[in-house]
Amino acid sequence: MKVLVICAVLFLTIFSNSSAETEDDFLEDESFEADDVIPFLAREQVRSDCTLRNHDCTDDRHSCCRSKMFKDVCKCFYPSQRSDTARAKKELCTCQQDKHLKFIEKGLQKAKVLVAG
């Protein structure tokens, strides 16, 4: 019983978090009208200008694509701390997804298959 309660709370937290991000995107537009909903959703689904996972996002850190549930985050690091070359001193950023979010996403996909089938 405890496991079911914990799983239910986890699922509700994830679902509310993903829907809250979508609502925040809607609220950012100052002139939001009902006619603007369809073009907004089309832009979010297509979004060809986003940076794919594990690709360079150094120049535009807010351009990472969105997976099915969560948005990827631009994480920066230095390639090598040992050498004094110019390349080692340059910061490198790539779009990545946290491992716990990846596991949650895969788990929910498997749960959907289990419930549906």
From Swiss-Prot:
Keywords: Amidation, Cytolysis, Disulfide bond, Knottin, Membrane, Neurotoxin, Secreted, Signal, Target cell membrane, Target membrane, Toxin. InterPro entries: Spider_toxin_CSTX_knottin (IPR019553), Spider_toxin_CSTX_Knottin_CS (IPR011142). It comes from Cupiennius salei (American wandering spider). One of its GO terms (biological process) is killing of cells of another organism. Residues 21-47, 82-87 form a propeptide. Belongs to the neurotoxin 19 (CSTX) family. 12 subfamily. It holds the Pfam family Toxin_35. It is found in: Secreted; Target cell membrane. The keyword Disulfide bond applies. The lineage of its organism: Eukaryota, Metazoa, Ecdysozoa, Arthropoda, Chelicerata. The modification Alanine amide is found at A116. This is Toxin CSTX-12. Its main location: secreted. The presence of a 'disulfide through disulfide knot' structurally defines this protein as a knottin. Heterodimer of A and B chains; disulfide-linked. Interacts with CSTX-1 (AC P81694), and with CSTX-9 (AC P58604). Disulfide bonds join C50-C65, C57-C74, C64-C95, C76-C93.
